[in-house]
Every structure is written in structure tokens, then in C-alpha cells.
Amino acid sequence: MEIFNISDISDIKEENKNRVAALGFFDGIHKAHQSIIGRAVEAAEKGYISAVITLDKSPKEYFGKTSEESLTPTNKKNELLENLGVNEVYYLEFNEKLQNLSAEEFINNILKKLNVDKVFCGFDYRFGVKGLGTPDLIKDSGIEVTVQEKEKIDGEKISTTVLKEFVRKGEFSKYKKYTGRFYSISGLVVKGRQLGRTINFPTANLELDGKYLLPDTNGVYTTKIKVNNKIYKSVTNIGYNPTVSDEKNKKFIETHILEFDEDIYGERIEIYFYEFLRKEQKFESFDHLKEQLKLDKKTCEEKDY
């Protein structure tokens, strides 16, 4: 899969090969997104290049209306798109120039230049200045358009907003129902205080490689971890480690991996969230902390997931 980062649309070169494009921001890549992208990939099998044309950030984020946290930061989004069979991804930098681009200019200077013959998008897809561009406008320009209608699960619309609420509330089974996978975050293992080793409970300290959305509740979660392409059960704490420190400037993400004893400093890992166990708490001593960690581990071992 080829990735193109476009900071200025004037840099887009006219292409000769015909493309089928999926249009949208696609944060979370839920089942409705997967349907849009999958249909584009399938249509491209008849001699086209399959492409996703998206933004490097959401307009809401650009205008400061939402936080920067994402369900699928760029690295994760690329991984999922490649798994769906996409040939090319175009990330348009959402800057002042793109913000003021008319809908007609979007069609002529992006879709037409990339030789897009067919477009797949959601029912609420909008583009151009003030979001005035609609799928019908693309259709009027001579490009074939297929619009994905609203999809629901249990009577609720499938949307990124709903997914984010699931993550914030720790409702990971519901997240899986809407996406087909458990919520995950990834990054590098870095050295922490190494206090876990002193109580025979070593942890991998994660430094995120993207601006991932985290659950609202600090505490302990049953998780799985992928390290060196192998999957292990794990128990993960998100929070400030109040037993160790009173500082609340930075949240720590620490994972104890079951049946594992390897040095993985500097390795990239991915943590998959399954269930919330308990809230983070301040213990009177390290002995009390150690006893609770043993209980957390036992609970994790006994759960079938």
C-alpha cells in the first residue's frame, strides 16, 4: 500500500490510471466504514486502483472543537486499511488552503486529477468550504457515486462518536460489536521506575506512538498484548500510580504480561482491551499493593478471553 501525504493540493499530479476512491475520515474504521472501503476495493478489482482519500486531521480538531485523541491514529489506520486491501491512501493536510477550497475545486483539483472514476462514501459525507459539497455534486461532475446508507446496531447508528463513548466508558465488548475487533493502543516499551520488579510484578511501560483515546476511568483492565507477533494475556493499569507518587502530570500505561519473562525494552507492543476490573487506588504500603496485584493477576488468569 502506498501512502501520500499532501500538504498542498497543487502538488497532486494528473494520473493516467483510473481509480476507485473511498472518501471519509474513517476514525475507528467501524463496520460501516469497512463496508464503504470494502466495496471500493471490490469495485477496483475490475482494472482500477483502490484509493482512500482522507484528511490528516478532522475539521473539528482543526477548529479546536474536540480533543486530539483518536481511535485509530495514522499508523493504526494505515494498518487497518492495508488489511482491507487498499492500494493507496491520500492524506490531505487540513490547513487554511484546504479549508477554503470550494467543492468544485475539490472535485476538479483532487478527484479529477487523480482520475477517480468511481466514489464510495457515507450518507453524511461532505467536502469543500463550509462542507457545502455533497455526493450529488460529485455525481453531477460525471463521477459514478455509491452512497452507503445509515447502518444501525441494536437500533443505534454506527458512528465514531458512539465508538468513542464505548472506549471512554470501558465498554469494549460493544466496541468489538461495532468494529469486529477489540480496542487497542500501541507504542514502544520504555524504562519506568522498575518498582514492579522489586515486588515480583514486572511491567512493560508503554509510550504511545499516537494520540490514542484512553478510557476515562483510571484503573486496572484485563487485556491481551501482542509482542514479537505473539499474543499473551496481560493485566494493564492506566493512571498515576498514587501509591508511588502524588504527581498527576502524566498518566502511565503499565502492563504485566502473564507467562512471560523476556527483555522487551524498545520493542513495539499492542495492547487490546477486554474488560474493566477495578479503579486505581492508593494503598497503605507496597505489601498491600502486592497483594492486590496478585488478586488482579489471578482474576485475569481465570477469565476466559
Set out the residue ranges of the language-model regions.
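N-terminal catalytic cores of NTP/NDP-binding nucleotidyl/phosphoryl-transfer enzymes
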Residues: 10-73
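Glycine-rich, highly charged phosphate/nucleotide-binding loops
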Residues: 69-77, 99-107
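Classical nucleotidyltransferase
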Residues: 100-203, 284-288
